[in-house]
Regions:
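Conserved beta-alpha-beta core of the PfkB/ribokinase-like small-molecule kinase fold
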Residues: 36-106, 126-128
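Conserved functional loop/turn residues at catalytic and ligand-binding sites
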Residues: 2, 43, 115
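Structured loop/turn residues at beta-strand edges in well-structured enzyme cores
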Residues: 33, 78, 114
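Conserved phosphate-binding/catalytic region of the ribokinase-like
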Residues: 69-70, 74, 101-172
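Conserved N-terminal subdomain of the carbohydrate kinase-like
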Residues: 1-36
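Short, flexible helix/strand-to-coil boundary loops that buttress conserved ligand/catalytic motifs
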Residues: 11, 94-97, 132, 150
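Short glycine-enriched, charge-decorated loop/helix-capping segments at active-site entrances
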Residues: 13-15, 95-99, 144
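Short beta-strand segments
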Residues: 1, 10-12, 41, 63, ...
Length: 172
């Protein structure tokens, strides 16, 4: 990590994702569809994401992970219940530059028009822009001493899942 707590380099063996094929997921579909929701990220193969979005009957929460991998969500955005992009990923998914709150609001509108039910667009130090069919709201970050940002996005997704399962309102 650097002096700001941001990861500078990571080494990961991503081969395990290649085993999560549509065929394998099909063998587990009953389990998935009996869950309360399904969380995916774009480390999954594109064909597996497509299969899940076509066959999963529970809400799908998606983490775009990176701009390089977020493209896998383009064909299935209308099947995603909740998405958690950052500004770069939102720009890729919507086709517009996302550089400030105004453009972030437009990106949220586009994602909602494409069929996504809830958008939590991370704007770094500016907080998160939340949007759904009822409107949009910027949620500021709580002041905190940041020591390390590794897995911050994963923790945020876990909190979104917990809030959804607990039927918390966005304001809560």
């Amino acid at each position: 990590t650097d002096e700001n707590g941001d990861m500078q380099l990571a080494v990961s063996d991503m081969e395990i994702y290649s085993y999560l094929t549509p065929e394998y997921i099909a063998s587990k579909l009953d389990v998935i569809n009996n869950a309360s929701l399904c969380v995916i990220d774009t480390n999954l193969p594109a064909e597996t994401i497509q299969y899940l979005c076509e066959n999963c009957t529970v809400p799908i929460f998606a983490d775009p992970v990176s701009t390089a991998k977020a493209v896998k969500l383009l064909p299935v955005l209308g099947k995603i219940h909740t998405i958690k992009p950052n500004m770069l990923e939102a720009a890729l998914l919507t086709g517009i530059p996302v550089t400030d709150e105004r453009s972030a609001r437009k990106a949220v509108d586009i994602l909602l028009e494409l069929g996504v039910r809830q958008v939590f667009l991370s704007m770094g130090a500016a907080g998160v822009l939340y949007g759904n069919a009822r409107g949009k709201k910027r949620i500021p970050n709580y002041p905190a001493e940041i020591r390390n940002t590794t897995s911050a996005g994963d923790s945020f997704m876990a909190a979104l899942v917990m809030a959804y399962l607990s039927e918390f309102s966005t304001e809560k």
